[in-house]
Amino acid sequence: MAMGLIRMWVAVVLLGVLSGSPRDGGLPDRHGAGNVTSGVSTAAPTPSSVLQAGKLIALTFDDGPRPYVLFGSKGAYPAPGLADVLDKNGVKATFFVVGWRLTPKTWGDRHEEENIGVTCIDAAKQLAGRGYEFEDHTFSHIELRTAERKKGEQWVLHDVARGAEAIKAVTGVQPRYFRPPDWLISRDARSQLEHEGYRVLTISSEKPMALRDVNSLDYLCAGRHPVGCPKPSLQDGVLKQVEQREKKGIYTHILAFHELSTTAAAMPQLINDLKARGYRFVTLAEYMKLVASQGQ
């Protein structure tokens, strides 16, 4: 009789442990809600195949280099330095820069030097030396389809080439990737650039989702009176887009931002939230290699 009661008691205890209820001493579900920020889950169930291949984020930033964003600004509108935030979190990013900013004695370079004592060229050299990637965002930063209609395809191709030359002159590295301003470029010009060896980034559904940029919409959050900024915050808007892609089985993302002080301010929380979801941060070149190895 006593032995029977003991066996029953052991069975009940084991059942409680295996049931997984934290309330009765069981083990919590590893795929629970995780940390939640502003209603967006920062931890998500992940297929075992993705865990083996890796959950990847490539952070990219357009329109620089802007030293006051990269290294921070003080005064009436203080802002954290984007490069300092990335370094502190052990994240390497890719910068799609505008060639004219890397030309000595331009207004942009003089303006930055006067304001924070660092020129655009100096900023690019510093970051390249710290392991960041620099890629092509044209020389002139104008809308390329309009430029092609007015000036011809050769002008567009030459402007992209000038941007690449400016980057190589400063960093010593030939750009391999190109992002058109606002992703707007004619099919013919894009084909020609790809023929010349560029990978042209896009948001078009013509490409697999893993190779499409995720538009952060951060430019809508800039200025004193932003209109259209994702709610409740920029980082939550990005996380929602990541969640939507995860629901479609996509766990690799190229996130497209701009060199803006408001974006730099959002980065610490966004990086923490993405790390909590199991993501690893890589440069764009590393991302492309790893995604290719996954067969995406």
Q: Which role does the model predict for each range below?
A:
Residues 1-9:
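Bacterial N-terminal signal peptides that target proteins for export
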Residues 19-25, 30, 86:
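Signals and flexible motifs at protein termini associated with secretion
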Residues 67-68, 102-105, 142-146, 184-189, ...:
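Short catalytic/ligand-binding loop motif for oxyanion handling, primarily in non-cytosolic enzymes
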